[in-house]
Amino acid sequence: MITVNVDLGDRAYPIHIGAGLIGRAELFAPHIKGSSVTIVTNTTVDPLYGDALRAALAPLGKRVSTVVLPDGEAYKNWETLNLIFDGLLTDRADRKTTLVALGGGVVGDMTGFAAACYMRGVPFIQVPTTLLSQVDSSVGGKTGINHPLGKNMIGAFYQPQAVIADIGALTTLPDRELAAGVAEIIKTGAIADAEFFDWIEANVDALNRRDPAALAHAVKRSCEIKASVVAADEREGGLRAILNFGHTFGHAIEAGLGYGEWLHGEAVGCGMVMAGDLSVRLGLLDEASRQRLDAVIAAAHLPTRGPALGDARYLDLMRVDKKAEAGAIKFILLKRFGDTLITQAPDEAVFATLAQTTH
């Protein structure tokens, strides 16, 4: 097992990475102070890992209940969030009840948001079971739900007590979900660590094959980078925005097609292709680096062409973005691997990028 720490003073927490961790009670025990635990999971993950988690928690002598949500990005909304509150209130959960998010990014984001809101804040633990949630969404305290007009527009910054990332859970992950997670790994290397990006290029096939050593290294390094960024800028005042490379275009794709048509990581992968193209058009990035970025995204079996939503529709969707100010779209663009720039772009350049990267 590897442990990475997120250094946030008195709200610091560990990220435990390894195989078989869901069944290890000693990883959960230090973070459960009250007499009850509510597991929040979904219809896909509960049959796979719910019993193992409940068995791990049993020796702790806590009252354990489970809320099972429908699976998919389309359910990341108020109605599903209320199912969590319904379960907590029915079970008479109190302020010391610990929520445990067992699932991917949707489960983690909604459980964290429920924890932030219920009785004005109860503790929660992240147990991410997808590659994307292990390398990205479970770390950093971003929680929330989607709105029909924009992704993740309703939420809170609320840190977990711990992240327990069991890479053994990745063996049951569908291929599309695995590729979606590799997209966030590529993003992390591209924005923050040129050497890690080199490693990803050399090992993308190993990641596609689910090689345990490659997955463990990718999760560890991605978490180290995200932890350092979050520690420096927890509430996305500046530096943390670089983690949204590929997300401005990507969120527009997700909202434009309807949540769940493309996986989040698929949209981010394509969004990175689009952001790379725009980076070259604005004279920030060299063409050879853009081609390297496109090649590794394609090698991860991610889409490299976006849907033809229309120029005006893309702009409208990108203006409904947490980085936008007074309706001005802000893009995270590459100068070189490991070096980014947050900037606006002329509409003409954006339209040229859309013409080149959509179909």
From Swiss-Prot:
The places in or outside the cell where this protein is found are: Cytoplasm
Q: Cofactor binding mode, per the note?
A: Binds 1 divalent metal cation per subunit. Can use either Co(2+) or Zn(2+).
Q: Which UniProt keywords apply?
A: Amino-acid biosynthesis, Aromatic amino acid biosynthesis, Cobalt, Cytoplasm, Lyase, Metal-binding, NAD, Nucleotide-binding, Zinc
Is-annotated flag, keyword Zinc?
A: yes
Q: Name one GO molecular function term.
A: 3-dehydroquinate synthase activity
Q: Does the keyword Nucleotide-binding feature in the UniProt annotation?
A: yes
Database matches in InterPro entries = Dehydroquinate_synthase (IPR050071), DHQ_synth_AroB (IPR016037), DHQ_synth_fam (IPR030963), DHQS/DOIS_N (IPR030960), DHQS_C (IPR056179)
What Enzyme Commission number does this protein have? 4.2.3.4
Q: What PANTHER family has UniProt attached to this entry?
A: 3-DEHYDROQUINATE SYNTHASE, 3-DEHYDROQUINATE SYNTHASE, CHLOROPLASTIC
Its function?
Catalyzes the conversion of 3-deoxy-D-arabino-heptulosonate 7-phosphate (DAHP) to dehydroquinate (DHQ).
Q: What is this protein called?
A: 3-dehydroquinate synthase
Its ancestry begins with: Bacteria, Pseudomonadati, Pseudomonadota, Betaproteobacteria, Burkholderiales
